[in-house]
Amino acid sequence: MFYTLQLNAKLQPFDRHDLEDIIDEFLSKEDLGETSGGGTLMSKEGEIEYCDIEISLNDTANAVEKLLRKLEDIGIPKGSKLYNENFSQEIGSLEGLGLYVNGTDLPKEVYETSDINVVFDTVCEILKDILVLTSYHEGSKDTALYFYIKGNFAEAKEQIKDFITTYPLCEKSRIVQIA
């Protein structure tokens, strides 16, 4: 049976592929099936809306239930779903925080003396105990950094607030719940 795992996640293809590999290893080890590819839906602006992983499950007892349990163990974003023409189930427990760093409206010297990698690494360090997945998108007006966490979006936003309000590159940034 073929299924689609639609991830409510803004993952770059290589980040999605890492997750696909974890799922494929599990399916192979448990003799349940295999992944057979994936895809990414982009918005008009070029930002990732969501991504899919295609899964071929053997028609064995409890294959879907075992896969669903594994997906919850791995951690995938809220609002994701596993489905085919005869089945659909929403899954996911991770909340998502999108940090959109302004790339056009700050003084030139801020861009010359600040580093987006410092922002990414610092937020990862602050959230390290609850962080599960990360990705990013480089747009024409901003760079979006995506953090998927075990926990509460509002609490994660509060945890990074001091850094965001003091690091010059984060001036005029936006924080959005993405899952």
Where are these regions (language model features)?
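A common structural junction motif
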Residues: 27, 31, 71-79, 163-171
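Short, intrinsically disordered low-complexity segments
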Residues: 31-65, 134-155
